[in-house]
Regions:
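DNA major-groove recognition helix of helix-turn-helix/homeodomain DNA-binding modules
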Residues: 32, 52-67
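Short C-terminal boundary/hinge segments that cap the last helix of small helical domains
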Residues: 62-77, 296
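The alpha-helix within a helix-turn-helix
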Residues: 17, 28, 58
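Conserved binding/catalytic microenvironments
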Residues: 3-5, 105, 110, 114-405
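Short alpha-helical DNA-recognition segment
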Residues: 21-41
Length: 405
């Protein structure tokens, strides 16, 4: 199997810089990095390995971060063509349905809808099966709207179900490089939550909104998450769901401030989330967000990588037992972050490959669509050309559409 030259973030960066007619010096100054570092990024000698760097470069070039990650070019990765194709029907469903104004007012029997909703929450979403969710969610959105409108006996359950499916829709859209669609799903979720009269559900909707706008508008995401955390704070002691969302909102604030290069603020938000996680323990999995001690540990690794502290992840990961986490997607995210951190240390690059391979086995679509995982695999392939390229690394590159047989 021969290795082909993949389109990396660095290559897209150079192409867009030329298209903009901007010099290395101008873009480097706008992004807050040195000219030599930018040159090495463009040549593939260094990785774009954090949100803060990716978003700074995108802002300097006046493009969306997805233009640099090439999210719309992922159809060559194994299984991703079907996932992207399914987004079309999802977009139509989000456009055609409004609260109390469904696109189709007939709907399916509630028992059938409840079974489909259970499948989304217990199988498709935890597996990060974007293609599977793309096939199921459009019809489910329309049918749940019909039930919420025309069947008062099931209205509350249908509204809670709509929050779940809008969360799933936003998850699919965001990870497939459709941030506008994720924002539409989050706004729908907000309208639904307003009907539930529940601080925890309102906090969940605001969390989804902050997540949806995070990459294109990091300061706005921070403001939304911080405001929502303040609003739900009075309920933390009496409502377990509110406590979990309070923790998730502070973790979102920690990530946003890390991406904005404000490490002290990030650490403060992380400490607040840690305190809540210690009280929550295993949690009740409110909103299928999984907040608790183990998930906090996952986020601790994630935040360390984002702050450029990849050397810490090996030690941080030692105390984390992933076996109790039902969501394969969440475990895959952890192993991806572990691989990202380990890859920064030459001595641990084989461990990085093993971590990424574990992540891919758990949630293949999520990992193959992850721009940072793709960057790491590309970089490791480049570094390995002088030596024997491991079978695992070569296989991952092929399945990501980064290498040809």
């Amino acid at each position: 199997m021969d290795v082909e030259q993949p389109r990396t973030i660095g290559q897209r960066l150079r192409e867009i810089r030329y298209w903009r007619g901007k010099s290395l010096r101008v873009v480097a100054e706008l992004a807050g990095i040195s000219e030599s570092y930018l040159s090495r990024l463009e040549r593939g000698e260094r990785q774009v390995d954090s949100r803060s760097l990716l978003e700074a470069l995108a802002a300097a070039l006046e493009v969306a971060p997805t233009e640099l990650t090439g999210a719309h070019e992922l159809t060559s990765a194994k299984g991703m063509g079907e996932a992207h194709a399914a987004v079309v029907a999802l977009r139509v469903a989000l456009a055609d349905n409004e609260l109390d104004d469904p696109a189709d007012d007939t709907g399916r029997p509630w028992s059938e809808l409840a079974a489909t909703l259970h499948r989304v929450n217990s199988e498709l979403r935890p597996a990060a099966d974007y293609a599977g969710m793309g096939l199921v969610l459009p019809g489910l959105i329309t049918d749940l709207h019909a039930v919420a409108t025309g069947k008062p006996v099931h209205r509350h359950d249908a509204l809670v179900g709509l929050l779940d499916v809008y969360a799933a829709a936003g998850f699919v859209a965001k990870h497939l490089g459709e941030p506008d669609l994720a924002s539409v799903a989050a706004l729908h979720a907000r309208a639904v939550a307003a009907q539930l009269d529940s601080p925890a559900h309102s906090a969940l909707a605001e969390f989804l909104r902050a997540q949806a706008v995070s990459s294109p508008a990091r300061p706005r995401s921070l403001a939304l998450a911080a405001r929502a955390a303040d609003r739900v704070a009075p309920c933390v002691g009496s409502d377990p769901g509110a406590a979990e969302m309070y923790g998730m909102l502070h973790l979102t604030c920690a990530l946003n401030t890390a991406a904005l290069r404000r490490p002290a603020e990030s650490a403060d938000h992380q400490a607040e989330a840690a305190d809540v996680a210690a009280r929550v323990g295993s949690g009740i999995n409110f909103g299928h967000q999984g907040f608790g001690l183990v998930n906090y540990g996952f986020w601790e690794v994630h935040l360390a990588v984002e702050r450029g502290e990849g050397g810490k992840v090996r030690e941080l990961a030692r105390g984390i037992d992933t076996r109790g986490v039902a969501s394969a997607s969440r475990r895959a995210a952890f192993y991806t972050d572990l691989g990202r951190g380990l890859a920064t240390e030459r001595a641990y690059r084989q461990e990085a490959v093993a971590a990424l391979r574990t992540a891919e086995r758990l949630a293949p679509q999520r990992v193959r669509a992850n721009p940072f995982a793709r960057e790491i695999v590309t970089d490791l392939m480049r570094r390995a050309r002088r030596d024997a390229v491991s079978r695992e690394l070569r296989g991952m590159a092929y399945r990501m559409g980064l290498a040809a047989s």
